[in-house]
Regions:
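Short, charged amphipathic alpha-helical "coupling" segments at sensory-output junctions
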Residues: 167-188
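The N-cap/first-turn positions of alpha helices
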Residues: 305-309
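Recognition helix of helix-turn-helix DNA-binding domains
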Residues: 303, 316-351, 373
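Regulatory input/activation interfaces that engage signals or partners
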Residues: 1-164, 168, 172, 254
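Regulatory hinge/linker segments at domain boundaries
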Residues: 181-185, 286-304, 372-373
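PAS-family sensory/regulatory modules and their coupling/dimerization elements
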Residues: 234-288
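PAS-family sensory domains
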Residues: 189-256
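Short, basic, alpha-helical segments at the C-terminal edge of helix-turn-helix-like DNA-binding modules
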Residues: 349-360
Length: 373
């Protein structure tokens, strides 16, 4: 049940907003304002997510000091806590409050102790994963300052009611961005880059990394001269968790589109500095066709099995080879292909591959470059 008739009107307005063709930064900014009018909060992070790795790829921040960013990502990727975004994305309840998860004792949450209290947000925290078609395209973390101001079930219901619309809006933004991406010159940022981190700042970076970072700076989640963009911090945090406690996350790799319109792959890894203190580095490189295909296929609303079939087809497997690899009959595979073609709007395997690589990869890659190079 929503909080009020006014909340229902706001929900409908937000649904229309999510299907209006806004790009991701503008959509997140508009959502921050619209939701705040119904579900009061004092600070928030509205984020885009890579549906394959469930890592944050960009963020719109409301009223949170920039100094809180390292603590936010450290808690999300290095430490165990309640209501992790990745768990919400995989769970049956994609929206949850800290007060409910801790039985009303907020101090049981590390996020509350290490970030909330330190930066003046002593109240409740509401977190949401925005999921559509089984894929998570975004998330939100809403915080309150007043220790007595707990989020209500009506607040949770309202945010849950807009979740699929937000996910669809962010998914559409990714696809629409591919169509309006500018062309590139042959030499722009083609080589992989390496960034070595000291907390949330750069300790060392290769020359090629600077070009990639420039494409992220000024985009939502990164400002020129500011700390690292959200996507880099998220991947570094995930790699740090893998280093720190021996429990690797599902992936330390994320894919996103830069403000220049290119697909960027980020990969976090550990470097042995020889000093006894492990360092975290992030590789920045053009996204590879297989990982790009996974994101694009999710954006078209394909099921997990349909994505598996599409990957086989795009890689050039025959019907018999694809069916054998997926342990299904050729007839079942053909049924999946029919559904895939309908969703993507193509009529053949060749058109499917062309849709993914010509429209989403080659159009944003350096001129003359080849996928996978």
């Amino acid at each position: 049940m929503l909080a009020s008739p006014g909340a229902e009107g706001a929900r409908r307005a937000i649904a229309r907003m999510c299907h209006s063709g806004l790009d991701a930064p503008d959509l997140l900014g508009a959502l921050a304002v619209a939701v705040r009018e119904v579900v009061g909060y004092d600070g928030a992070v509205w984020a885009t997510m890579d549906p394959a790795s469930l890592l944050i790829t960009g963020a719109h921040v409301e009223e949170l000091p920039r100094e809180s960013a390292p603590a936010f990502y450290e808690n999300e990727y290095l430490h165990d806590d309640v209501n992790k975004l990745s768990r919400l994305a995989r769970g049956l309840r994609p929206v949850a409050t800290m007060s409910e998860a801790t039985g009303g004792v907020l101090s049981r949450s590390r996020l509350h102790r290490e970030l909330g209290l330190v930066f003046g947000f002593a109240g409740d925290n509401l977190r949401a994963a925005f999921v559509a078609g089984g894929s998570c395209w975004g998330a939100a973390a809403l915080a309150r300052r007043d220790p007595a101001a707990h989020f209500t079930q009506a607040d949770v219901s309202f945010v849950a009611s807009i979740g699929s619309h937000v996910a669809e809006g962010l998914r559409a933004a990714m696809l629409l961005g591919a169509l309006s991406a500018p062309g590139r010159s042959p030499d722009d940022g083609e080589a992989p880059g390496l960034v070595v981190l000291d907390g949330d700042r750069i300790r060392a970076a290769s020359a090629s990394a600077e070009g990639w970072l420039e494409e992220l700076a000024g985009d939502f989640g990164g400002r020129p001269g500011d700390r690292l963009p959200a996507a880099v911090l998220a991947v570094a945090g995930a790699a740090g968790r893998m280093v720190g406690d021996g429990e690797p996350p599902p992936s330390t790799r994320a894919v996103l589109r830069t403000r220049a319109g290119r697909w960027l792959g980020l990969h976090g890894l550990r470097l042995d500095s020889g000093s006894g203190e492990p360092e975290v580095a992030v590789i920045l490189e053009a996204a590879r066709p297989p990982e790009l295909a996974a994101v694009v296929m999710s954006a078209y609303g394909l099921t997990a099995r349909e994505r598996d079939v599409a990957q086989q087809v795009i890689s050039g497997a025959s019907t018999a080879e694809a069916a054998a690899a997926l342990h299904i009959s050729p007839y079942t595979l053909q049924d999946h292909l029919k559904s895939i073609f309908d969703k993507v709007g193509v009529r053949s395997r060749a058109e499917l591959a062309k849709e993914v690589f010509d429209r989403h990869y080659a159009a944003a890659a350096p001129l003359g470059g080849a996928p996978g190079r």
